[in-house]
Each structure stands twice: as C-alpha cells, then as structure tokens.
Design a protein with these regions (language model features):
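Short amphipathic helix-loop junctions that connect adjacent transmembrane helices
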Residues: 135-151
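Short, small-residue-biased leader/transition segments that mark boundaries at the very start
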Residues: 1-8
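Pair of pore-lining "gating" transmembrane helices in MFS-fold secondary transporters
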Residues: 12, 113-129, 211-215
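Loop-to-transmembrane helix entry
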Residues: 42-44, 146-159, 238-242
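Helix-to-loop junctions at the C-terminal end of transmembrane segments
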Residues: 63, 166-179, 262-263
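Structural signature of the two symmetry-related core transmembrane helices
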Residues: 181-196, 275
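Intracellular juxtamembrane helix-capping segments at the cytosolic ends
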Residues: 19-34, 219-232
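Symmetry-related core transmembrane helices of the 12-TM Major Facilitator Superfamily/SLC fold
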Residues: 70-89, 269-287
C-alpha cells in the first residue's frame, strides 16, 4: 500500500543522505587532520561508534516508555538539528578547503591513483567483517555457542566495545608504528579472532575471538580514509568518495553473503571463510606498505 511505498522511499532517501554526509564528514576530518599535523582520524570514528551506542540506548529508553514513534523520531530530529546548528559554524569552509588543496592536480579518470582502489579493497574487507559482527555475532552465539540467555549478546558487546576502544587508541599506534604495520596487525586480529570463535565455539574463547575482531576492524577503515585524504594526487573529497563507496559495499553485501554461506556450509565455516578477508588486509598492506606511509 501507499504507506509502505512512502516508508521505502524515505529509507532510500535516508540511506543516500547518510552516505553523502559520511563523505562530507570524513572529508572535513581529513582537512582537520592535515591542519592539526597528526593522526586523529580514528578518534573521529571512535566518536561515531559512541554515537551508535548512544543511539541504541536512547532507542531502548523510548521503546520502554511506550511513547508514540512520531515523538521518538521528532525528538531525535530536533536533537540532530541542534547538534548540526552548533557544529556548522566550526566547519572548514570552501575557501579554506580550496587553499589546502590548491596544488592538487585536476581530477581525471585516466590519471586516477590505483592505490585508491587498494584502499577501498581493504575498507571493503573491514566493513564486510564489521557487518558480520553486527548481524551475525548474536546469531552465532544463540545457534552455535548456546550459552545462557544472558550471554547471547556477549560476542556483539565484546566486538563493538573493542571497536570503539580501538579507535581511540589507534592514532597513537599509527603515529608510532606507521599505517602499514597497524593495518597488518588489524588484518591478523580479524583473521585470528574469527578463526578462534569458529574453532572453539564456547563462551569464553568465542567472546575473546569477537573481541579480537573488534580491535581488528576498529582501525582498518579510518586508516584507509586518512591515507586517501592525504594522498595529494587527488582532492580529499573525491578520494574519500571512491574509497568509501567501495568500502560500504562490503557492509551491504557482507551479512547476506554470510547468510548464504551459512545455509550452504554452516555458520562456523561461514565465519572461517570471512576471516580470510583479514588475511587480505594484511597482504595488501604488506604489498603497498611504502605508499601507505
């Protein structure tokens, strides 16, 4: 009926606007990082993770109060407008952005830097595994690990908590060890974490496995965005558009692909296969390490 059509249209528009805001926000973050003179991109993504936690808590509060959904949505809309209105005046304006990128060559598909596609590939792998934790960790615990009801979401909480903490820690590691080394460690943590959870489907090792995955996925995407924005061969906004578009495709296809693999082979084998994406991150980072520094 018309209400479902309107809702579908609204969700499509919401998704498009959310992605545009993602690109704009990360472009601003790259420009701030350049001006700041040190690695801070992962901390920005850490605040995004805190926003997700806050949204979940607020949603749970509204659900428990049984208030109408229009009150819920209206309150969030008003809060969002307030935050945007306050933050807007602190944004880097177009003139400042152009000054920062005045020496950047004009964009051309013929001269596009191949490293952007490799960064996108690593971002794709990271977001594929992030989507797996979001959508399948609780299913894995309920159907494979089978702990007490109170611990069904242990893997999800461990993974998301580690991802948030890891993002606030990552900038210091990138500064000290370089982005290539950190990406290789991230890939190893994803690989080892998912294999641990698949090999030992018991409460403690499976929870530890998803904890390691959370630390692994925490920094992979922010580092890729940061490198893309600082390449100097292309405008930061265009670089992040390319990398984020490839990356978010992993978030889109990851959960259904895991579902298809789980139906065909079982969930333990499915997440074991997904773990190989961590190996891919480490391999690509090792191959192009000099370009990432």
């Amino acid at each position: 009926d018309w209400s479902s059509d309107v809702c579908s249209s609204d969700l499509i528009a919401f998704g498009m606007m959310a992605n545009l805001m993602n690109i704009a926000t990360n472009t601003q973050a790259c420009l701030v990082e350049k001006m700041y003179g040190r690695n801070i991109m992962s901390s920005f993504h850490g605040l995004w993770s805190l926003g997700g936690f806050s949204g979940g808590i607020i949603g749970a509060i509204f659900a428990n109060t049984l208030l109408p959904i229009d009150v819920h949505f209206g309150t969030i809309l008003a809060l969002s407008i307030l935050i945007i209105a306050v933050g807007f005046r602190f944004l880097i304006n177009d003139a400042m952005a152009k000054a920062e990128e005045e020496d950047v060559p004009k964009f051309s598909f013929k001269t596009i830097d191949p490293i952007l596609f490799l960064l996108g590939l690593m971002g794709f792998a990271g977001m594929f595994c992030e989507g797996t934790v979001y959508d399948w960790s609780s299913v894995y615990f309920s159907s494979v690990v089978k702990p007490d009801e109170a611990f069904i979401r242990a893997g999800y909480v461990a993974g998301m908590g580690a991802m948030t903490l890891g993002r606030f820690m990552a900038d210091g590691f990138v500064t000290k060890y370089g982005p290539a080394r950190v990406l290789k460690v991230c890939g190893g943590l994803i690989l080892g974490g998912l294999w641990l959870a698949a090999a030992l489907p018991y409460l403690i090792p499976a929870t530890l496995g998803f904890l390691l995955v959370g630390f692994g996925i925490s920094s992979s995407v922010p580092i890729c965005y940061s490198i893309a924005g600082k390449l100097g061969t292309i405008k930061a906004s265009i670089a992040i558009t390319i990398v984020s578009s490839i990356s978010f495709f992993g978030f889109l296809v990851g959960p259904p692909v895991i579902g298809w693999l789980a139906e065909a082979t079982g969930l333990r084998i499915a997440i074991s296969i997904a773990a190989c994406l961590g190996l891919m991150i480490a391999f690509v980072a090792a191959k192009v390490g000099k370009r990432l520094s």
